């Protein structure tokens, strides 16, 4: 049975990648062995597909702000509803903000494990600029950064 302890094992056993992956249909997002491990172990291939669907907004934000680092967060409630959000840190005028949302999507059902007795369980991934030419971003687990 897959529990949140399985998730902790995934995050704990991935510290870097010897191999990089991408979807055949989208060259601007690469991802690490840790993200592949997350997808395979939790049968959560939809996570990368969702991030790909957000990449237009990420690239637009990158071009406007030159910010090269984003956080992808998935929040899962006990009733399995939740959200997926991409955000970054940065300045708006002269004011610094540690949470500038790029895109936020409510998701009616998320099949990821939750922490017992926690109202919401969050999963974090990092999305970092990998190449300028061609423009590519890398999705990775925090333990791989």
What are these regions (language model features)?
Residues 1-110:
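N-terminal "domain-start" segment
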Residues 94-145:
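Short, compact, well-ordered microdomains
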């Amino acid at each position: 049975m897959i529990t949140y302890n399985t998730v902790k094992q995934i995050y704990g056993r991935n510290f870097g990648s010897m191999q990089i992956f991408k979807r055949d249909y989208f060259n601007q997002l690469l991802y690490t062995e840790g993200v592949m491990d997350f997808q395979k172990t939790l049968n959560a291939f939809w996570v990368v597909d969702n991030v790909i669907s957000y990449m237009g907004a990420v690239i637009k934000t990158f071009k406007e702000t030159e910010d090269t680092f984003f956080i992808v967060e998935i929040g899962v409630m006990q009733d399995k509803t939740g959200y997926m959000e991409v955000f970054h840190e940065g300045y708006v005028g002269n004011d610094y903000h540690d949470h500038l949302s790029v895109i936020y999507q409510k998701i009616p059902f998320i099949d990821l494990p939750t922490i017992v007795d926690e109202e919401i369980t969050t999963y974090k991934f990092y999305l970092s600029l990998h190449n300028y030419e061609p423009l590519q971003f890398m999705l990775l687990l925090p333990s791989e950064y």
